[in-house]
Each structure stands twice: as C-alpha cells, then as structure tokens.
Regions:
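A glycine/serine/threonine-rich, flexible loop-to-helix segment
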Residues: 51-54, 133, 145-172, 214-216
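Residue(s) in the substrate-gating loop at a strand-loop-helix junction
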Residues: 100
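Short C-terminal tail/terminal secondary-structure segment
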Residues: 105, 189, 195-216
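Active-site helix of classical SDR
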Residues: 80, 116, 124
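Catalytic Tyr-X3-Lys loop
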Residues: 35, 43, 57-77, 92, ...
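The beta1-alpha1 cofactor-binding region of Rossmann-like NAD(H)/NADP(H)-dependent oxidoreductases
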Residues: 11-23, 61, 182-183
C-alpha cells in the first residue's frame, strides 16, 4: 500500500526554552499537535575527555557542564517540559530519548559523556512512571557505535582507516562492524507506534550489534 505523508523542518535551540516554545507553536500551527517527541540533541566536548595531557583531575568545570547541559538539559529536560504536558493533556503521546552504550557501561576517556548518558537513561525511567497514567509513553534507544561528526576523530585515522579504538570496538562487537543510521529507524518507529508499543514504557531498546552482550 502507498500512503501520502508530509514532512516539514523547524529549527530551534533545544537548550533555549523560548526557542522550544516557538518551535512547538509553529509545529502546532503547521501540522497539528505532535504525538511523538524524539530527543536527538546530544554530543561531547573536547574539554571533557580524559587524555594523557588532561587527566580526570584536570577536567575543567565548563567542559564538564557543557556536556551535561547538552545531553541532559537539551536532550531531555527542556524538550520534555515543553512538549510533554500538552501530550499529557491530550491523553496520548510517545517520547523517545537517545541513551548510549555508555549509559550501561562507562567507556574510557569520555567520562562526562558516559555519566550524562547514564543520567538520560535514569531520567527516562523516572518520567515513564510519572506520565504512565496520563497516556504518555517514555522510552529510550541505546545506539551502539555509529560514526558521526562528534566521534569521527576517535574512530578514524587521518587517512580514513579505522583507528585503534575502532578496532577495539569491532573486537568487542559480535557483528564486527559499525552500525548504519538506517538501522536505528526500526526501533524508533516501533516505540513511536501507538498500536505496536501501546504497553511499552520505561524501556530501553539496544541497537548495538551485540556490544553490550560481549564479555570474554
């Protein structure tokens, strides 16, 4: 079967309440009340990465705070505060947050990122309980390793070959490769679906090629 869909893009700053409010109003006017919120804002900061030159005890507070602001405030708190109450008022909605394998197992070097993503997973479960009786489901997706601009320097050498860190990831991933962004779509569609996932809340779907299942 074929269906006709309409897609529109709206820009906003996920760390600015006023910008989120304006975006919400624009979406309401153009497309109607949103029933799905996918919080995809997130990232890391070079001043929050442990290196030989900058050990843990030297991490500057601004670098640490910027990672938590982006991943927890912009990637969860403010968007949920803006869009969630309206969903609760209508009695239905699906909120999907982006966690990380670092939510489950902290990785070397990226301490602030790991800690902030662990907080996203915890906050997801908290909010799922708060809004369960209001018809709003709150879940998360844990992506494995997917190359993106924020991690490209860690995963690839200057000549484009996999870095030692990438090789270590492959060795710890039963499927032996990076994920493709398209492979996250199924999990998102499932969690967004009121029909398929109507009794699913407070859950985390892991899409990692088996990374978290590998020990020795």
């Amino acid at each position: 079967t074929q269906s006709k869909s309409t897609a529109q893009f709206f820009t906003c700053d996920a760390m600015d309440p006023a910008s989120l409010k304006s975006c919400h109003e624009a979406v309401d006017q153009a497309l109607g009340a949103p029933t799905v919120l996918l919080n995809a804002a997130g990232g890391n900061h070079p001043d929050a990465v442990v290196t030989p030159e900058m050990p843990f005890e030297k991490i500057p507070l601004p670098g640490w705070a910027s990672v938590f602001d982006l991943n927890l405030v912009g990637g969860f708190l403010l968007p949920c505060q803006e869009f969630g109450p309206a969903m609760c008022g209508r009695g239905k909605g699906s909120i999907i947050n982006i966690a990380s394998v670092t939510s489950h197992l902290p990785l070397s070097k990226v301490i602030a990122y790991s800690a902030s993503k662990a907080a996203v997973l915890s906050a997801t479960r908290f909010l799922s309980r708060e809004w369960a009786t209001k018809g709003v489901r709150v879940n998360s997706i844990t992506p494995g390793f997917f190359p993106a601009e924020q991690n490209r320097k860690l995963l690839f050498n200057e000549d484009g070959t996999p870095s030692d860190r990438a090789k270590a990831i492959f060795g710890h991933t039963p499927m032996g490769r990076f994920g493709d962004p398209s492979e996250l779509a199924g999990a998102a569609v499932y969690l967004a679906s009121e029909k398929a996932a109507s009794f699913v809340t407070g859950s985390d779907i892991v899409v990692d090629g088996g990374f978290l299942s590998q020990t020795i």
